[in-house]
Amino acid sequence: MNPGDLLLHLNPLLLLASLAAGALHLRDGDSEKRLLQRVSLGLLLGSLTASLLLLASYFYRTALEFEYVADYSAVELPLRYKLAGVWAGRDGTLLIWCWATALALNWELWRGSGAGEDSQPHSDAGQQRLLVLFASGILLALATIQLAINPFTHSDPVPTEGRGLNPLLQSPWMTIHPPIVFTAFGFAVLLYAAGLAALAAHGEAWLDVGRRWGRWFWLLTASTLTMGGYWAYTTLGWGGFWAWDPVETSGLLPWLACTTFLHAAVMSKRKRQYSLLGPLLAMLVLLLVLLESFVTRGGIWLSVHAFLPTQSESAAQRFLAVMADDTSVKGLVVLLGSCLAVTGFTTVRAYLRAPATEPRKREKLDEWLDEDTTFFGAIYTQLLILTVALVLLLMGVNGYLPGFVFETRLALFVALLAALFTIYTLQRWYEPRRLLSYCIAAAVASAILGFILLGMRPGSWMAGAALPWALLAGWATLRYLWSYRGKPLLPRLRAWGPYIAHLGIILIALGYGISYGLDQVETVELEEGSATEAAGFTITLDDVVMRSGDE
C-alpha cells in the first residue's frame, strides 16, 4: 500500500472519529469530545491536502506506475497540462470535492469556536453542532466513494508512455475551470447541512452559514459557467457558448437553485419569512449538484462533456449497466437517494409542526403588487424556471433536445420574472398601476418585435422579444443604483452589489437573445485544395492538421 492509499483509507476513519465525538458532544456537552471532533476534522483536512499535493507531484514527474497518471499525462506535455491532469478525470475531481468540503467544515467549526459557543443562544449552539455533524456525514459518504475511484491505484502492467490529455482539453481554461467547479461543490455540502439543521432544530445559526457558503457557491459557479461558455466558444468548437447540452443544463440548475435561495434568505433575515422554503432551497442546491455529478459521471445522458462514453442502448439499459459495473456511480446514486429521502422526511416533519398561519386577504391592486407579494412571485417564478429546465433535462435523457425547445418554454417565465423584478424595484417611486402599465407595454412590444423578426429568420424572435424586457428591467436597476448616489461609500457598495449582479444577468440574457436569435449558420463541405463562396468570402481548404492548444 503506497502513501496515497494510506491517506485515502485514513480519511473515513478520521470522519468516523469526528462523528462519534460530535454526537457525544451533542448529547452531553463535554468539551473534551468537542476538542476531539475539531482535531479529527483538522487532521482530515491535512490528510486531504497531503493527498492532493502527492497526486500533483506524481503528475509533475509523470509517474506512469499510477494508472490515473498514465491515463491523463505524458512526458511531452507542458507542465501546466501535466498538473491539469490532476482534475482531468473522476478520481481527482472527487478528491478536490472532498478537500473543499473539509476546508469549509473546518472553517465553520473553528469560527464557531472562536466566536464562543457558550456565548451563543442554546438553540443556535445546538443547531451549529448538528450542522457540523450533517456535513461530516455527507463527507464520509464522499470519502467512501473515493475509495472506489482511487487515483493512487498502480498500473498493471506499467506503460512505457502515458495517454496524455485530450487535445480538446489542452487549453488554459483547463487549468482553472474544473478545480473551481468542484470547490463550489464542496461548499454546497455546507449549504445542505445548514438547511437540514434549520429543519431539525430551532435557531438562527443556519442562516448566516447558508448565506456565507451560498454566496461563495453562487460566485464560483457563475464564474465557471462564464468561463465554460467562453472556453466552448473559442477553443472547443462545440457549437457556441451555450448549447443546452445535458451537462451544461445540469450545471445551470444548482446555480438557479442557489440564486433562489439567496433571494429567500434576504427575507428570512429581514422579516423571518420563508422559514420552511429557505432551508429547503439550501438543501436543493446539493441535491442538484449530486444530479449534475451523476449526469457527468454516469454516462447515462448523451453529452460531449461526460466523463464516461455513452453506449447505444436506451437510458434504462445504460443506467443498469453502469450500476452493475461502476461502484462509484452506485455510491453516488445511493448518496443522492439518501439525501432525497432525508430532505423529504425533514421537510414534511417541519411542515406538520409549523404553526398554522392565516392567509392574507388582498382586495386592491396595490395589495397584490406590494413588496412581499411581488418578491414571493419572483421566488416562485425562479422555481418554475428551475422546474421546467429540470423536466426538459430528464426528457432529453435518450437524445439531444435542441436549444429552441428550452428557449420557447422558458421565455414566458423569464418575461414574468422581469416584470416582477421591475415592480418590486420601482414601487417606492412609482404607483403599482403605473408600473403594471409599463409591464403591459413591454409585453406588447416584446410580442410585436418577436413576431416581426420571426418572419425574417427562424429563432430571431428571441432578439426582439428580449429587448423591451431588458430595457425595462435595466432601467429599474439603474434607477435603484442612482438613488444611492449620495450615500456613504460602504452602504452604497452594499446596496449596489446585488443590483449590479442583476444588471449583469440582464445583459447576459439580452446578449443570449441577440447572439442566438440573429446568428447565421451556413454549412460548407470542402475537400483539400477546393474553394467555395460563403457569406461573401472565398474559403479555401489547404490542409487538415491537428495541433495541441499551445501551438
Give the ranges of each region predicted by the language model.
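Extracytosolic and intramembrane catalytic regions of membrane-associated proteins
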Residues: 538-551
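Phosphate/diphosphate-binding loops
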Residues: 260-290, 520-522, 533
